[in-house]
């Protein structure tokens, strides 16, 4: 094998190894952050097999049902505080802004923001779940036993 061909082969091998390592690291990083959101139980007790808890200061999404009677609004500002739960612990969500029209106590929401204490999320965005019919099977299993108020029946006077 002549020296020029040997040099080319060496460069091709280095390039293939480099691309493989970069792809592997990228896939590993993506697999660690693929969760759509944490439930309040996962936030408090940890998530996954190793029960890994998120760190204070971490940006995340937390989803659950708004606890009835927990919504507190500041009369002077647009600041709102409320609690969400799934089947266990409650997580406090602090939000500055106008809440979505579908936001109600007993309604499912997803809040995106920064964890400022182990059970307190300062939300930058609050999304109200609008389709109460579909729920992923894992979440449906966790949410069994939680009272859910259907806003359609409350408006008609049937849910009271």
Swiss-Prot record:
GO terms for biological process: cytochrome complex assembly. Keywords: Cell inner membrane, Cell membrane, Cytochrome c-type biogenesis, Heme, Iron, Membrane, Metal-binding, Signal-anchor, Transmembrane, Transmembrane helix. Heme binds at residues 130, 134. Residues 30-160 are periplasmic. Gene3D superfamilies: Nucleic acid-binding proteins. GO terms for molecular function: heme binding; metal ion binding. InterPro entries: CcmE, CcmE-like_sf, NA-bd_OB-fold. Its main location: membrane. Residues 1-8 are cytoplasmic. The chain crosses the membrane at residues 9-29. It is a single-pass type II membrane protein. GO terms for cellular component: plasma membrane. It comes from the Bacteria. Belongs to the CcmE/CycJ family. Heme chaperone required for the biogenesis of c-type cytochromes. Transiently binds heme delivered by CcmC and transfers the heme to apo-cytochromes in a process facilitated by CcmF and CcmH. This is Cytochrome c-type biogenesis protein CcmE. It comes from Idiomarina loihiensis (strain ATCC BAA-735 / DSM 15497 / L2-TR).
């Amino acid at each position: 094998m002549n020296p020029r061909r040997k040099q080319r082969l060496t460069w091709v091998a280095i390039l293939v190894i480099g691309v493989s390592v970069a792809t592997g690291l990228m896939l590993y990083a993506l697999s660690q952050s693929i969760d759509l959101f944490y439930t309040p139980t996962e936030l408090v007790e940890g998530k996954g097999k190793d029960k890994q808890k998120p760190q204070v200061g971490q940006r995340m999404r937390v989803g659950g049902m708004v606890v009835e009677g927990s919504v507190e609004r500041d009369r002077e500002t647009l600041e709102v505080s409320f609690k969400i739960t799934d089947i266990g612990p409650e997580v406090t969500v602090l939000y500055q802004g106008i809440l979505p029209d579908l936001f109600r106590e007993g309604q499912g929401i997803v809040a995106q923001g920064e964890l400022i204490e182990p059970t307190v999320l300062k939300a930058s965005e609050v999304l109200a779940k609008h389709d109460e019919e579909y729920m992923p099977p894992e979440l449906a299993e966790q949410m069994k036993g939680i009272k859910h108020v259907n806003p359609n029946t409350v408006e008609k006077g049937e849910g009271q």
